[in-house]
Amino acid sequence: MHPDSQLETAVKNGFDPKSLYSTELTKVNEPARTILEQYSKIPAEKVLQHVKDLKDRAFEVFPYACIGQASFLELSIASSPCYPEMLDRVKKGDRLLDLGCAFGQELRQLIYDGAPSQNLYGTDLRPEFLELGLDLFLDRSFIKSHFIDADVLDDKSALVTQLTGELNIVYISLFLHVFDFETQIKVAKRVLDLLAPKAGSLIVCRVVACRDQAIGNATNARLPYYYHDLASWNRLWERVQEETGLKLKVDNWEQDDALAKKHPLEGIYMLGSSIRRE
């Protein structure tokens, strides 16, 4: 279901999008603050107001919780155990896509850490978010990364026509849960199509998971999201392997995450996963 349709359905069922907006943004945590000060050259005393203004503009585009609660500032890619490999490979020429990148904040982490920006790709359904990312990081004049507004399931999108078989790494963070289980399988297969058809092609995921799926999916009547537990996550990739004939090595871990600790649902945690083509 398209996010606009999801929101419309949720509102009809009594959901108030404004409930996702928090006014309690009083500081910008690391590493986002350092990136905004040193990469974007924003004076320290102006960082907080700069972020608040951007947050308000973005929430008007679409009321995602990650925007309303400013969790897009909680950069997470560097906390993945796969990050050293991802960074090293991009430095050596591999191409990495952040799928559902929002403002491209994780890509700026890679660039700040020395990744050549021209080897990085970001895609989001909403072109406004890609533009807002350029405003957030003030790098419109010099960043060489490739930003593509696209629906990952649209066969005719620029993402598909330009990048099928061309990528080496795809990073997916806080994205898959907005789809139901069967659609997640379609997305996973599409991502595999985008990757180079060779051993070592890599998907790295950060997934909202729940120890008790009954609790995690109890909000479906209002927000039709699908929260995995470990068993369902493994089942997803087993299905993908069965349907594609590909052999994948799937490694999972529980990832310490500030966003999960603040989540209102009981038993929510952040599931990290790497899916490597063999």
UniProtKB/Swiss-Prot annotation:
The family line of this record is: Belongs to the class I-like SAM-binding methyltransferase superfamily.
| Changes seen on gene knockout | Drastically reduces the production of andrastin A.
Pathway as given in its UniProt record: Secondary metabolite biosynthesis; terpenoid biosynthesis
Please tell me where S-adenosyl-L-methionine binds in this chain.
D124, L125, D151, V152, L153
EC numbers for this chain:
2.1.3.-
What this chain does, per the entry, is described as: Methyltransferase; part of the gene cluster that mediates the biosynthesis of andrastins, meroterpenoid compounds that exhibit inhibitory activity against ras farnesyltransferase, suggesting that they could be promising leads for antitumor agents. The first step of the pathway is the synthesis of 3,5-dimethylorsellinic acid (DMOA) by the polyketide synthase adrD via condensation of one acetyl-CoA starter unit with 3 malonyl-CoA units and 2 methylations. DMAO is then converted to farnesyl-DMAO by the prenyltransferase adrG.
- GO biological-process terms attached to the record: methylation; terpenoid biosynthetic process
EC class, as a word, reads transferase
The protein's UniProt keywords, in alphabetical order, are:
Methyltransferase, S-adenosyl-L-methionine, Transferase
The record ties this protein, via InterPro entries, to: Meroterpenoid_MTases, SAM-dependent_MTases_sf
Name of the protein in its database record: Methyltransferase adrK
The record's GO molecular-function terms, alphabetically, read:
methyltransferase activity
Q: Subunit info?
A: Homodimer.
